[in-house]
């Protein structure tokens, strides 16, 4: 079925507008908002689904609501951050006539405070995800720039051993310092595996189902 003439005419106008270079910076900000919303939903929904049904108690309705709420918050925050970051970058470029490396840091710095500055579980997870990658990247950058010598042997096995040693030590003796979702995961792995009553909660279920 062909589209109505009015709709086809509108699409022609919209597509012509999207191709105009003079509006590219503003339109890039809008598409960044769109991409942030989509990406946030795509990565949060599966994570929330798994974590909620593995570790959260409550009715099916409560679990579904928790999944939707977490997905919405992540999607909305990421969309706002991309919008803010790209908008500030465009403004900096317009004011100064070109871009500088400091522009990226300043725009993201302000966006981070405005969007991800609230201390909650979702923002904590996002920040910790980024922090690990930032530290890796800075280590590689320091080697590339010659600030530190390139290792003569692969340091990854030692790093792995230290990370796993520390996280299990923290879990066993200073658990409250770990992020809640990590506590839940490690409890499932290392403590729930110590308890069973029969074959049902040894192989089929993690914990015995309550009898009716």
Swiss-Prot record:
Protein name as it appears in the record: Peroxisomal membrane protein 4
Upper lineage: Eukaryota, Metazoa, Chordata, Craniata, Vertebrata
Gene: PXMP4
Entry-listed glycosylation sites: 57, 206
Subunit structure: Interacts with PEX19.
Note: Hypermethylation-mediated silencing of PXMP4 may be involved in prostate carcinogenesis. PXMP4 undergoes hypermethylation and silencing during the transition of prostate adenocarcinoma cells from androgen dependence to androgen independence.
Membrane topology: Multi-pass membrane protein
Main location: membrane
Cell location: Peroxisome membrane
């Amino acid at each position: 079925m062909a589209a109505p003439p009015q709709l086809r005419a509108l699409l022609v106008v919209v597509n012509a507008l999207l191709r105009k270079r003079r509006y590219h910076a503003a339109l890039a900000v809008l598409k960044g908002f769109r991409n942030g919303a989509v990406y946030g939903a795509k990565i949060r929904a599966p994570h929330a689904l798994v974590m909620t049904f593995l570790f959260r108690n409550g009715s099916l309705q409560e679990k579904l609501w928790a999944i939707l709420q977490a997905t919405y918050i992540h999607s909305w925050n990421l969309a706002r951050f991309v919008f803010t970051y790209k908008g500030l970058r465009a403004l900096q470029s317009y004011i100064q006539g070109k871009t500088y490396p400091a522009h990226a840091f300043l725009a993201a710095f302000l966006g981070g405070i405005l969007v991800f500055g609230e201390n909650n579980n979702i923002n904590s997870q996002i920040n910790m995800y980024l922090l690990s990658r930032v530290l890796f990247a800075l280590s590689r950058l320091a080697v590339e720039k010659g600030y530190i010598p390139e290792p003569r042997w692969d340091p990854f096995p030692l790093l792995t051993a230290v990370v796993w040693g520390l996280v299990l030590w923290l879990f066993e003796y200073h658990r409250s310092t770990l992020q809640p979702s990590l506590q839940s995961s490690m409890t499932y792995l290392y403590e729930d595996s110590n308890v069973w009553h029969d074959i049902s909660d040894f192989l089929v279920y993690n914990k015995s189902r309550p009898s009716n």
